[in-house]
Each structure stands twice: as structure tokens, then as C-alpha cells.
Amino acid sequence: MSANKKPVTTPLHLLQQLSHSLVEHLEGACKQALVDSEKLLAKLEKQRGKAQEKLHKARTKLQDAAKAGKTKAQAKARETISDLEEALDTLKARQADTRTYIVGLKRDVQESLKLAQGVGKVKEAAGKALESRKAKPATKPAAKAAAKPAVKTVAAKPAAKPAAKPAAKPAAKPAAKTAAAKPAAKPTAKPAAKPAAKPAAKTAAAKPAAKPAAKPVAKPAAKPAAKTAAAKPAAKPAAKPVAKPTAKPAAKTAAAKPAAKPAAKPAAKPAAKPVAKSAAAKPAAKPAAKPAAKPAAKPAAKPVAAKPAATKPATAPAAKPAATPSAPAAASSAASATPAAGSNGAAPTSAS
């Protein structure tokens, strides 16, 4: 069935077939015309030969009748000779016309074949177009296969850009946190607190350590617990021997006994950095101008905030030796600060 199936006819196929058949038919017609004219010329030549023979015979008869003295035979022979001569002249004219026709035909054949070369070029152009069309379906799948990886790489580049943007945002957020932490660390106004506040501001735990002074007790207790949970896995191995024995009992006693918090502060201070020291000094100075409830609330926030600061020795090993010798000095300064807090706390109660 596939062998008998005809190809789909397109204008290019039709043009190729018509141009091919036109050249073939033209060449065939020219050859046939030349053959026919040659046959006609040969036929006329035969007829002329026969007419000449008859004329020769008629002339011999006329001579014989003239010798015999037969007048009727002479007249009949003369009529036949005249007819044959007319026919012979006609044949000669036709032969001349046929020869002229053959000469013109040959000239026309040459001209038409020259013109038909343009038709042959059209046929060749149509054939090339059909061949290129047959070659295109073979190249298209290869071109599509080559285009798909290019599309994938183009699609991968936009996918890489959103991945780069989230990476840039976390880098920008710590910078914003440090900018927010530095103004909170500056009001301490102590030379010893500033060098310790800047390294502490670089980590994510510095923000909860600086902000609890301006917020209620519940918020500072919730934020450090959430943020130190991410910082503890890296900081626990180094911070356990220093921070846990001192900071955690102090935090527990601060949560259990609000009245005993000024006494629990010196226990939490030796493990904390100068950041915690300056933060503890600030609540000690503020209760003179605020009600009695706020001094009791702020010290409750500080030991809890000291826990993120206590985990920092894991990230800054060089600060540990500086922090441990200053523990007795911190204890003495905190002890001197707590009587001041007690006296300041007693003044508002008497005023109330």
C-alpha cells in the first residue's frame, strides 16, 4: 500500500513536473516536426519523380503519335503532358515550400530550446527547493535538542538569582542588628563597656541583651529564650564550664524569688562580660527616678538577658581570660551597687 501511495502534490512538485514535462514535450514536438517535414519532403520528392516519369512517357507517346500521324492520340498526349507538367510544377513548389519550412523549423527549434533552458533552470530550482525541504525535517530535531539545554541554562540563571538574594538578606539583617545594638550599647557611657559591646553586637544574641531594659518582663524572657536556642548548639561545649554553674542558678533564683534579685546579681555578674556589668549598672541608677515596680521588673530581665551574653565565650575565646580575672572586681562593684539600689528602692516606697 505504501508503494502505491502517491506523494502529496505541492506547488513546488507541480512546478517541477510541469517544467520537466514542458521541456520534454517541446523537445519531442520539435523532433517530431522535423521528422514530419522530412517525410513530407521525401513524399513530394517521390511524387515529383513519378510525375517526371509520367511526363517522360507522355512525351514519348506524343512523339509516337506524331510519327504515326494520329491526330487524336497526339492531342490526348499533349493534354496529359500539360497536366503532368502542372503537377510537376506543383510538386516542385511544394518541395520548395517544404524545404523552406524545414529550414524555418530548425531555426525555431533552436530558439525554443534556448528559451526552454530557462524552464530547465526553473525545474532545477524547484528540485533544489524540494531537497532542502526534505533535509529540514532531519535538522529540526537536532536544532530543538540543542535549543532545550540553552533554555534550561537560561531558566537556571533566574533560579540562581533568587537563591543569591536570600543569601544577601541574612547578611544585611545582622548589619541592621548591629546598627540597632550599637545605639543601645552607647548609653552605658563607660570606656570598659564599649569594647565589649561592639563584639557582642556582631552576634544575633546582642539584640536581646540590649533591648530588655525598655520592654516588659515577658518579652525579654521570651526573645532570649528563642534566640539563644539557635546559638546554644555551637556555644554549649565551651560555655558549659564557665556560664552554666553561675548564670543558670542565678536565672532560676531570679525567676523564683523577685525579692532576692538584688542579692542574686553578684552571682550572675562574674560569668557575664562587661556588657552585663554596664547593663546591671544602668538599672541600678534608674530606680531613683522611677516607681518601685520597675526596678523590681528590670533586674528580673537582666539575669535572663545575661544568659545569651554568657554563651559568647564560645565565639570569642580571646575574651575569656580577660573576663575571669575581672570577676572579683565585678563582684565588688556589684556589691557596692546593690546597697545603692536598696536605698534608692526604699525612697520611692516611703514617698508612696
Curated annotation (Swiss-Prot):
It comes from the Bacteria. The promoter for a critical alginate biosynthetic gene, AlgD, encoding GDP-mannose dehydrogenase, is activated only under conditions reminiscent of the cystic fibrosis lung (i.e. under high osmolarity), and at least two regulatory genes, AlgP and AlgQ, have been implicated in this activation process. PANTHER family: SPORE COAT PROTEIN SP85. One of its GO terms (molecular function) is DNA binding. Residues 138-341 have a biased composition (Low complexity). One of its GO terms (biological process) is regulation of single-species biofilm formation. This is Transcriptional regulatory protein AlgP. InterPro entries: AlgP_N (IPR047725), Plasmodium_CSP_Invasion (IPR051860). The C-terminal domain binds to DNA. It is unknown whether binding is specific or non-specific. Residues 128-352 are annotated as: Disordered. Keywords: Activator, Alginate biosynthesis, DNA-binding, Repeat, Transcription, Transcription regulation.
